[in-house]
UniProtKB/Swiss-Prot annotation:
EC main group: hydrolase
Recorded GO MF terms: hydrolase activity; metal ion binding
Record function comment: Putative C to U editing enzyme whose physiological substrate is not yet known.
GO BP annotations, alphabetical order: mRNA processing
Organism for this UniProt entry: Macaca fascicularis
Protein name: Putative C->U-editing enzyme APOBEC-4
Similarity-based family: Belongs to the cytidine and deoxycytidylate deaminase family.
Gene label: APOBEC4
EC number: 3.5.4.-
Family matches, as PANTHER family: C-U-EDITING ENZYME APOBEC-4-RELATED
Any Pfam family hit: NAD1
Stretches assigned to the CMP/dCMP-type deaminase domain: 61-177
Residues reported to bind Zn(2+): 93, 127, 134
Presence of keyword Transport: no
Keywords associated with the record: Hydrolase, Metal-binding, mRNA processing, Zinc
Length: 363
């Protein structure tokens, strides 16, 4: 294959021109080296916080796109890490650069058959708008390499709101990509994944600073992203939920903050009743119960045209608090149907008991 990129050795890794015709541009601060590997992939804490909306949650629309990636073997060993940044001068997204035919990842996997799993950590979910076609390129890449599995973690959804002109394309493309589960995982960054990204890709952060508790504002944004991607794709995300572990860490301030937060701001279109009239400090820490993050084994499988799009995955989730259970029952899930069925069974059993008592009384 004739690659479209050029790679150069740097002090702590490599720097890559994803398209060999790119040159230095005054319109883009990252041109022409939009892909960086190894320790060259690290960014400053300030840049990371601004682009990923960490640690307080996304507060404004993000125009810059930054994607960290890891290439791993089937056993989970790291082959390479790196990042790809968007080109503001040529308006190119990171996923488009990485998954381009004859591009960097295409060449990397073609020349190293031990790579079996790709993990992306994106500030924006991939799109499929006409000028980018990111998801289409990812989809074609997976068809070319049927032994590769892919996990995509994002800090915010990109152009999926109904009032955006191209949202229908993006939502439909996300559904198509999610239908490849379990080969493809779409999930928000949350919990311990934040700590992993900080440790691997952010410079100047080490020790206890990496494992600081996730703040309430960021945690609520992650939870909203999880429900939203589920509503779009019909596939429950593989994510770490926000749950307070009061037994091991009785942080009453964090608990009160989470339970009294006006959830109608975190879940647009839903009506929630506040337990307190004062909004909490979104900087209050939240204690997480982490679900184990495992690398999926390589799967040699094709797309089944008869496979339904709506896939429900059953995970053993940690026990939820009473307040969280009340809030989630208001969401449009199947819980209400199950509740009705259980109530009907209970009523039927109660009637049966009354009939038995009447029969005994007649005797």
């Amino acid at each position: 294959m004739e690659p479209t990129y050029e790679e150069y050795l740097a002090n702590h890794g490599t720097i890559v021109k994803p398209y060999y015709w790119l040159s230095f541009s005054l319109d883009c601060s990252n041109c022409p080296y939009h892909i960086r590997t190894g320790e060259e992939a690290r960014v400053s804490l300030t840049e990371f916080c601004q682009i990923f909306g960490f640690p307080y949650g996304t507060t404004y629309p993000q125009t810059k796109h930054l994607t960290f990636y890891e290439l791993k073997t089937s056993s989970g060993s790291l082959v390479q890490k790196g990042h790809a940044s968007s080109c503001t001068g040529n308006y190119i997204h990171p996923e488009s650069m990485l998954f381009e035919m004859n591009g960097y990842l295409d060449s990397a996997i073609y020349n190293n058959d031990s790579i079996r799993h790709i993990i992306l950590y994106c500030n924006n979910s991939p799109c499929n708008e006409a000028n980018h076609c990111c998801i289409s390129k990812v989809y074609n890449f997976l068809i070319t390499y049927p032994g590769i599995t892919l996990s995509i973690y994002f800090s915010q959804l990109y152009h999926t709101e109904m009032d955006f002109p191209a949202s229908a394309w993006n939502r439909e493309a996300l559904r198509s990509l999610a239908s490849l589960w379990p080969r493809v995982v779409l999930s928000p960054i949350s919990g311990g994944i934040w700590h992993s990204v900080l440790h691997s890709f952010v410079s100047g952060v080490s020790g206890s600073h990496v494992f600081q508790p996730i703040l309430t504002g960021r945690a609520l944004t992650d939870r909203y992203n999880a429900y939203e991607i589920n509503a779009i794709t019909g596939v429950k995300p593989f994510f770490t939920d926000v749950l307070l572990h009061t037994k091991r860490n009785p942080n009453t301030k964090a608990q009160m903050a989470l339970e009294s937060y006006p959830l109608n701001n975190a879940f647009p279109g839903q009506s929630f009743q506040m337990t307190s009239g004062i909004p909490p400090d979104l900087r209050a820490p939240v204690v997480f119960v982490l679900l184990p993050l495992r690398d999926l084994p390589p799967m040699h499988m094709g797309q089944d045209p008869n496979k339904p799009r709506n896939i429900i995955r059953h995970l053993n989730m940690p026990q939820m608090s009473f307040q969280e259970t009340k809030d989630l029952e208001r969401l449009p899930t199947r819980r209400s149907v199950e509740t009705v069925e259980i109530t009907e069974r209970f009523a039927s059993s109660k009637q049966a008991e009354e009939k038995t008592k009447k029969k005994k009384g007649k005797k």
